[in-house]
């Protein structure tokens, strides 16, 4: 699952991951993740800076909830300086934009295979 308010990012990552064989779901509104009840993704790519919501707050919430705490979360941001705060929020990993697809795939494979 990809959550990013930039449609270009959603499309680009979605196309690349589908090409690699992943089933991809996405949302431009990170707040919708707060109401996940039935279908949980194998991994969540979550932008930190989205309109009206901070991805770190979503991450904290999901990591506190019993039903979602085991979902690996990779927080993504254009600011490399906030990696520490991303990890403090409970993220399993961090990726700085712009990134290489190989770096993204390595993080996805590491977390999906270990979960």
What are these regions (language model features)?
Residues 4, 47:
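Active-site residues of response regulator receiver
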Residues 7-25, 111:
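Two-component/phosphorelay signaling modules centered on CheY-like receiver
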Residues 10, 51-52, 97:
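The feature encodes the CheY-like receiver
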Residues 26-43:
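Acidic, metal-coordinating helix/loop segments flanking the phosphotransfer/catalytic sites
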Residues 99-112:
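C-terminal output helix
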Residues 92:
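Short, glycine/charged-rich "phosphate-handling" switch motifs in NTP-dependent
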Residues 74-76:
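Hydrophobic/aromatic residues positioned on beta-strands within the core alpha/beta folds
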